[in-house]
Swiss-Prot record:
The gene is aroQ. The active site is at Y26 (proton acceptor), H103 (proton donor). The record marks R21 as: Transition state stabilizer. It is an enzyme of class 4 (lyase). This is 3-dehydroquinate dehydratase. It comes from Pseudoalteromonas translucida (strain TAC 125). It catalyses: 3-dehydroquinate = 3-dehydroshikimate + H2O. GO terms for biological process: amino acid biosynthetic process; aromatic amino acid family biosynthetic process; chorismate biosynthetic process; quinate catabolic process. Belongs to the type-II 3-dehydroquinase family. GO terms for molecular function: 3-dehydroquinate dehydratase activity. Homododecamer.
Amino acid sequence: MAAKFKLLVINGPNLNMLGKREPDKYGSRTLSEIMSELTCAADSLNVELTHFQSNSEQALIERIHDTWQAIDYIIINPAAFTHTSVALRDALLSVDIPFFEVHLSNVHAREAFRHHSYFSDVAQGVICGLGAMGYHAALEAAVNQLQNSN
């Protein structure tokens, strides 16, 4: 059997409030429910998936630094840091691990300040507006890219 790919899902600020915060935009499911379903999907693909959520930019950066040479792919929903965090972008670039940027809502159909991302130009791809299915799409695409690169 081939070695398992190792993926990390990183979720930024306020995503711990999913299911309570603006369900019309983000849905009624909790982050725990979404990550549990994604972990099951990863298991079926022979992928070792871990996930991490923090409201702290520092904690997110440190977790990214910890992935160096330990993770094959990152799926990140930087949430509000999408529009503000050069430091988080630089952390991703420093570990040189491919990543997908995921957003539950369609950020381009929202307020103008949400249209700019510090990540999209260095991401392998951007998935937005699909709700929790965006994580599944990123998982499948990451596995496909990893399989095709080996």
